[in-house]
Amino acid sequence: MSRAAVPSVRRRLLVNLLVGFVLCWLSVAALTYHLSLKQVNRLFDDDMVDFGEAALRLLDLATEDQAGEDGSITEIIERSREAIQGLPLLRRESALGYALWRDGQPLLSSLNLPPEITAQGPGFSTVEAQGTHWRVLQLNIDGFQIWISENLIYRQHTMNLLLFYSLFPLLLALPLLGGLVWFGVARGLAPLREVQAEVQQRSARHLQPIAVEAVPLEIRGLIDELNLLLERLRTALEAERRLTSDAAHEIRTPLASLRTHAQVALRSEDPKAHARGLLQVSRSVERISTLMEQILLLARLDGDALLEQFHPVNLATLAEDVLSELARQAIDKDIELSLHQETVYVMGIDLWLKAMVGNLVGNALRYTPAGGQVEIRVENRAQHAVLRVRDNGPGVALEEQQAIFTRFYRSPATSSGEGSGLGLPIVKRIVELHFGSIGLGKGLEGKGLEVQVFLPKTQPDATRPPARGPDSGRSHI
């Protein structure tokens, strides 16, 4: 894409402001022209009225002067002509023309009055003569009529001069305004360039928030969202580095055990010892496989949940399916496994919720001794679906209850060497992604451990995930 085709805030602001200035200038010019023309026409019309009234008064005076004498109409006309010609209004570039009538007979007229001009009646009218328009005024008094005409070209010329002297300074100011607009836009967008320069200097290891103290209010929201994104990236990268480091450390032990058992099996000449070695190799491989599966699951859970994949899930049915898969493990250890469920729906993803229930029940079966009990309850509360997994095993000491949600943590009192230390961290993350909370308590008969999961319940036909509440993802210990 060419540079000119790339959207530019600066270019858009400049164009909008400059076009706005030009449109405002044209609007002011048009309004000024209209108002000035109206005012000028009124002033010129008033001049024509004053001229006509003055001419009629002079004619009346000339008639009175000759009334007591034996004067002819010709003398009256000549005296009137001399008086009218002396009026100031006739000295302005011969703009006005006039004609004097008495009882329908012409008495005198000016040389600049076209013969084809005729008044349309008393008052003002506009007529066309000699290819131009004329303003004509007819006044009547005592049998006399006077026509005063004015070529509108003179008015237009006067109007053009007035408009030129009024608007030309504004026209000269347009380039200055354009320069000020350009400077103002460039200065106003300077914070964007500063933010751009700061972001360009960032590396993959430098994900600290951008300072917002000097950021204008208009882009502070953008910077806040960018800082949130940087924080999420920093958290994700730290979690990935921590997971990689912890996984490398945790997988070293089962790999060493696998190597040892394989070497023993290879060196042993006793068939029974050889078989025992291969069995240990198989168990080590299974443990490594389980560990890797949980590491991969936890890595996927470190990303945000895809809310568009959420749908109503029957938690009671899901728990029943999980228990049917783990029944053999309970039978092998002679553990009484029971389920008490109420139908309740939660909004979520089946596979993740199944992994959550499976990890909780699997942990209970793993750490409960032979002949023990594991109880699962699914309860339908007013606003929540509650999952309870209780056992009568050794439990977890109070000072360790917060630590068991840490990745790869295994309690010294309960560790059998089989767990990966990822089960409860996976459960907690799944609960957080489903807008729920998790807590710990006493198990069956006042001993062992109870894990409580609270999830927002929904309707079977719901289509939207629940809103995140204030306690979402919080552990209640």
From Swiss-Prot:
GO-annotated biological processes: phosphorelay signal transduction system
Triggers of expression: By cationic antimicrobial peptides and by Mg(2+)-limiting conditions.
Top-level taxon of origin: Bacteria
GO cellular component: plasma membrane
Residues recorded as bearing Phosphohistidine in the entry: H249
InterPro entries listed in its UniProt record: HAMP_dom (IPR003660), HATPase_C_sf (IPR036890), His_kinase_dom (IPR005467), HisK_dim/P_dom (IPR003661), HisK_dim/P_sf (IPR036097), Sig_transdc_His_kin-like_C (IPR004358), TCS_sensor_his_kinase (IPR050428)
GO MF annotation terms: ATP binding; phosphorelay sensor kinase activity
Pfam family, one: HisKA
Transmembrane feature ranges: 13-33, 161-181
Subcellular location: Membrane
Residues covered by the HAMP domain: 186-238
Region (Disordered) location: 455-477
Alphabetized Gene3D superfamilies for the sequence: 1.10.287.130, Histidine kinase-like ATPase, C-terminal domain
Task of the protein: Member of the two-component regulatory system PmrA/PmrB that plays a role in the regulation of resistance towards polymyxin B and cationic antimicrobial peptides in response to limiting concentrations of Mg(2+). Also autoregulates its own pmrAB operon under Mg(2+)-limiting conditions. May function as a membrane-associated protein kinase that phosphorylates PmrA in response to environmental signals leading to activation of specific gene promoters.
Residue intervals of the Histidine kinase domain: 246-459
EC number(s) given by UniProt: 2.7.13.3
Keywords: ATP-binding, Kinase, Membrane, Nucleotide-binding, Phosphoprotein, Transferase, Transmembrane, Transmembrane helix, Two-component regulatory system
Listed name of the protein: Sensor protein kinase PmrB
Reaction(s) catalysed (UniProt annotation): ATP + protein L-histidine = ADP + protein N-phospho-L-histidine
Membrane topology reported for the UniProt record: Multi-pass membrane protein
CDD domains documented for this protein: HATPase_BasS-like, HisKA
Primary location class: membrane
